[in-house]
């Protein structure tokens, strides 16, 4: 019924013969927002990303819903907070098949949907989950010739060209370009290629303050940065292909990354898999020549959960009630910079599992606004390794609080400083309120499904991610 209503909405949204907009969704793997020079910290030469930002809007506060690829990518598809995706809130879990996903809704309305590279996941396509073809027709045939060590080898841009040649030019399209770079491992000599191909020397490489400044760390960072630069060349080629096909003006180009940079500090996760900004704050820029004013910087806090409602509304389709994200179309249509929607003044993210075995836990929630960040970490088992009951699973294992104005890297925990008690309580109350309203099991105490899913993904990992009838969910 919802889909029918959406189709009825669609027919009234566009004049006869008017083409609905296309979408090119370009997603890298493991890249914090500051990696891009457009944000003012690095010296990374990524001209294609910069072009999209200059001809569209650069989002200063774009966030993944989780610092982990599986749950973050699931939110792009479902338009929901990661904790609302049930088994899909865990890497190596699955998105329940009854949950509407944006690519299937677009396809049902006449969009041609395709992808290259990494789609949703890694995860399971159990009988209870969405099918493996939910991102449309796969284009993976084209490969790079003699790619440098560490690069995946997929020629993403050439595969996009194949998609453009395959599609019906009279119909709109949605294409998911899942670039696997800059995910580790990286090539041992790619720091040399960074200077040779992109002109970036080791002394120009930006290092976070929690990373020791050594020659080895600079080389490691340079090898990582090289892959970002290589990814940008594919974006450049795709933009040129859109122009050649006459589709650039009518295409919303969205460029982002699924979670933050994979980086450690004294063995502790500070980026990917962490609740800090370097884990969930991602690059995000959008360009739509026919529909957006160029040259804008937007400070609204936006989430991956907002993307699916945006794509649907832009296509003239009804947004299902299941999608709790809010469409960004009013922001895209605005001519202003800065804070466009006053209520977008904070963001809440979190994580349940990123491949660890009990008793190690990376389960967390984080809420932040323009000034402060409040972090809660949770345990999942007791000291004897026994699973905690629901009430205990709601209780914080550790609380952290940061003044982002004075400490943007979140290194000085002020949770016990009485001067910040009121601000800490304000964000804690806001986290509980949003968690209760949105059904976060860590707030409501309804942790049975999450406990079972944690057992499921841990067992899948021990079994090498092979299907088995002995797993907690029917495969």
Label for each model-derived stretch:
Residues 443-457:
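Short, charged, surface-exposed hinge/linker loops at domain edges
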Residues 404-406:
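Extracellular, beta-strand-rich glycan-interacting domains
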Residues 1-6:
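Sec-dependent signal peptide recognition
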Residues 12-399, 408-429, 436, 442-443, ...:
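Formylglycine-dependent sulfatase
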């Amino acid at each position: 019924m919802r889909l029918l209503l959406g189709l009825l909405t669609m027919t009234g949204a566009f004049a006869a013969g008017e083409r609905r907009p296309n979408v090119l969704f370009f997603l890298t793997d493991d890249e914090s927002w500051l990696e891009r020079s457009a944000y003012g910290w690095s010296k990374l030469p990524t001209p294609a990303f910069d072009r999209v930002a200059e001809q569209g809007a650069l989002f200063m506060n774009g966030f993944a819903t989780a610092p982990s690829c599986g749950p973050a990518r699931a939110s792009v598809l479902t338009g929901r907070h990661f904790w609302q995706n049930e088994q899909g809130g865990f890497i190596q879990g699955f998105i329940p098949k009854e949950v509407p996903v944006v690519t299937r809704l677009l396809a049902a309305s006449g969009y041609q949907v395709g992808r290259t590279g990494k789609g949703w996941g890694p995860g399971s396509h159990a009988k209870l989950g969405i099918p493996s073809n939910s991102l449309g027709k796969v284009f993976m045939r084209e490969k790079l010739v003699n790619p440098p060590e560490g690069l995946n080898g997929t020629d993403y841009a050439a595969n996009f060209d194949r998609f453009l040649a395959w599609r019906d030019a009279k119909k709109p399209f949605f294409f998911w370009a899942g670039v696997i770079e800059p995910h580790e491992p990286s090539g041992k000599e790619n720091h040399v290629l960074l200077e040779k191909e992109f002109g970036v020397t080791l002394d120009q490489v930006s290092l976070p303050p929690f990373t020791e400044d050594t020659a080895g760390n600079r080389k490691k960072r340079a090898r990582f940065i090289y892959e970002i630069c290589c990814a940008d060349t594919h974006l450049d080629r795709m933009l040129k292909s859109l122009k050649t096909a006459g589709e650039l003006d009518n295409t919303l180009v969205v460029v982002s990354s699924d979670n933050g940079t994979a980086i450690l500090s004294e063995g502790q996760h500070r980026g990917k898999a962490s609740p800090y900004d370097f884990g969930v704050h991602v690059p995000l820029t959008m360009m739509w020549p026919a529909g957006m004013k160029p040259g804008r910087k937007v400070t609204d806090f936006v989430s991956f959960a907002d993307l699916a409602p945006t794509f649907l509304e832009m296509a003239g389709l009804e947004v299902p009630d299941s999608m709790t994200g809010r469409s960004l179309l009013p922001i895209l249509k605005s001519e202003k910079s800065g804070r466009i929607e006053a209520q977008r003044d904070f963001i809440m993210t979190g994580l349940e599992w990123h491949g660890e075995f009990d008793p190690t836990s990376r389960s967390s929630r984080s809420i932040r606004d323009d000034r402060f960040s409040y972090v809660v970490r949770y345990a999942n088992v007791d000291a004897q390794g026994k699973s905690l009951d629901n009430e205990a699973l709601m209780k914080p294992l550790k609380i952290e609080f940061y003044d982002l104005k004075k400490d943007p890297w979140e290194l000085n925990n002020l949770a016990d400083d009485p001067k910040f008690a009121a601000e800490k309580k304000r964000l804690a109350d806001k986290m509980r309120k949003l968690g209760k309203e949105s059904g976060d099991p860590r707030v409501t105490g309804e942790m049975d499904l999450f406990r079972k899913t944690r057992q499921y993904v841990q067992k899948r990992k021990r079994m090498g991610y092979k299907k088995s009838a002995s797993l907690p969910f029917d495969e």
